From Swiss-Prot:
The gene is gatB. One of its GO terms (biological process) is glutaminyl-tRNAGln biosynthesis via transamidation. Gene3D superfamilies: 1.10.10.410. This is Aspartyl/glutamyl-tRNA(Asn/Gln) amidotransferase subunit B. GO terms for molecular function: asparaginyl-tRNA synthase (glutamine-hydrolyzing) activity; ATP binding; glutaminyl-tRNA synthase (glutamine-hydrolyzing) activity. InterPro entries: Asn/Gln-tRNA_amidoTrfase_suB/E, Asn/Gln-tRNA_Trfase_suB/E_cat, Asn/Gln_amidotransferase, Asn/Gln_tRNA_amidoTrase-B-like, GatB, GatB_Yqey_C_2, Gln-tRNA_amidoTrfase_suB_CS, Gln_synth/guanido_kin_cat_dom. Its EC number is 6.3.5.-. It comes from Cutibacterium acnes (strain DSM 16379 / KPA171202).
Length: 497
């Protein structure tokens, strides 16, 4: 059952939303955070485990150096300060997903702190301040059996899979985001999108929200206009898409607005986002005073990255998405809308590689964001996995440019390339798809169509040359789209002049 909601504009008239985002990034390391177990969580349950990630007595952890390097690179990309000295801590809690009854995380000494990220939303640039980015391990996975929708409520029993326990995470926490007004959910979505693109550019994570590589907990409260007193916040979990981040925040803003308009209090609690119905439901009540009894991890030495190493990692950072977008937008003369659609489709690198292979930017964009994007969506794969390379797209466009193919024939060539029939030229040869420009073959078809359409032919003789389009269409149909339309038009006008 959904809650009563206050219209969004009414909420904005009286309240200022304050947003905070906690984002967990699953790192693409081969092994777990503190042991040598594989991070492949798709294996049979409880097969990628060992005494360390199960927390068995006497086991000793050792920190994953690759995870530390990834954390520093993330911090640098987010304009953070990198701690000269930090350490891990034990976050104590009791729940079946962590057998040792504590999570190894960081508390008051994160590896990265005080950063920022500029994001664009609705044609404006907003700065999101980042409080910290710290390292921690993931928990195991619960499977509740016998309940509804996999929830613990009504379940007869629960199963635990610890393959995920100990997988390296980076948690990125923003400072309270204020002053955005009605655009708060939109800016949060843009922040998540840019964060995802940065992780992919760095190569530290697959950053697939639908697969749990990138997980967001969205906090929001309402502050009365003209007041500096923060309202009671809720934390919405289970937000697994960019659209859901925006939708969950907007829903919570309207839900809280209704409660406050009725003189009721907002309860500080976790909420769960329901994707199907696009609403939140109550989880558990929370308190700012929750005591996890943090204390320094005694089994791990402190981390002290040298300044030389940090500066080396800074120098080796790849071009980040915002800089690449600005550079390519200028080079290609794309509109803001065109660049945004390319970024949102994850096509920027593909477009750049296609242009580097000799294709014009506009043509590269046309193929990747229309025909190939549609085929990728139908197949349920990423655009890069659709079955056609940037070089092949450039080859395809060259065949169009030199008159060998029409756009319609080129679409058939795409089908052939994806089906594994070879490069574009091989598909053209194998399927016999080249445009027919031979006057003898075209002339015969033109004569037949003129003879079959005397009234249209008479109009053309009378000076209505635009009527030639009807004859061209029939000829293209007869020749299965392979006729050179320009030459067909010339022949029609020559014969009827």
């Amino acid at each position: 059952m959904t809650d009563e909601l206050l219209p969004y504009d009414e909420v904005m008239a009286n309240y200022e939303p304050v947003v905070g985002l906690e984002v967990h990034v699953e790192l693409s390391t081969a092994t777990k955070m503190f042991c040598g177990c594989s991070t492949d969580t798709d294996k049979d349950p409880n097969t990628n485990v060992c005494p360390v990630c199960l927390g068995l007595p006497g086991s000793m952890p050792a920190i994953n150096g690759h995870a530390v390097e990834s954390a520093i690179r993330i911090g640098l990309a987010l304009n953070c300060h990198i701690a000269q000295w930090c350490r891990m801590a034990r976050k104590n809690y009791f729940y079946p997903d962590m057998t040792k009854n504590y999570q190894t995380s960081q508390y008051d000494e994160p590896i990265c702190y005080d950063g920022w990220l500029d994001v664009e939303a609705d044609g404006e640039t907003f700065r999101v301040e980042i409080e910290r980015a710290h390292m921690e391990e993931d928990a195991g996975k619960s499977l509740h059996v016998g309940g509804s929708d996999g929830r613990i409520s009504g379940a007869s029993h629960s199963l635990m899979d610890y393959n995920r326990a100990g997988v390296p995470l980076i948690e990125i926490v923003t400072k309270p985001i204020r002053g955005l007004g009605a655009k708060a959910p939109q800016v949060a979505r843009a922040y998540m999108a840019q964060l995802r693109d940065i992780m992919i550019a760095l190569g530290v994570s697959e950053a697939r929200m639908e697969r749990g590589n990138l997980r967001c907990d969205a906090n929001v409260s309402l502050m009365p206009r003209g007041s500096e007193t923060l309202g009671t916040r809720t934390e919405t979990k289970n937000v697994n898409s960019l659209r859901s981040v925006e939708g969950a925040l907007r829903y919570e803003i309207q839900r809280q607005g209704y409660l406050l308009s009725e003189g009721r209090k907002v309860r500080q609690q976790t909420r769960m986002w329901q994707e199907a119905g696009e609403y939140t439901i109550a989880g558990r009540d929370k308190s700012d005073a929750e005591d996890y009894r943090y204390f320094p991890e005694p089994d791990l030495v402190p981390i002290a990255p040298s300044r030389e190493w940090v500066e080396q990692l800074r120098a080796e950072l790849p071009e980040l998405p915002a800089a690449k977008k600005a550079r390519l937008s200028s080079q290609w003369q794309f509109s803001e809308a065109d660049m945004t659609s390319a970024v949102n489709a994850g096509a920027l690198d593909l477009l750049e590689a296609t242009v580097d292979a000799g294709c014009q930017p506009a043509a590269a964009r046309k193929w990747w964001l229309t025909e190939l994007s549609r085929r990728a969506n139908e197949a349920g794969v990423d655009l890069a996995e659709v079955g056609m390379t940037p070089c092949q797209v450039a080859q395809l466009q060259k065949l169009v440019d030199d008159g060998t193919l029409t756009d319609k024939l080129a679409r058939q060539v795409i089908d052939g390339v994806i089906a594994g029939e070879g490069d574009p030229q091989q598909v053209v040869d194998g399927r016999g798809l080249a445009v027919v420009s031979d006057d003898a073959a075209l002339g015969s078809a033109v004569d037949d169509v003129i003879a079959a359409n005397p009234q249209i032919a008479e109009k053309i003789r009378g000076g209505k040359v635009q009527a030639a389009g009807a004859l061209i269409g029939q000829i293209m149909k007869v020749m299965k789209g392979q006729a050179d339309a320009k030459r067909v038009r010339e022949l029609i006008l020559e014969k009827l002049s």
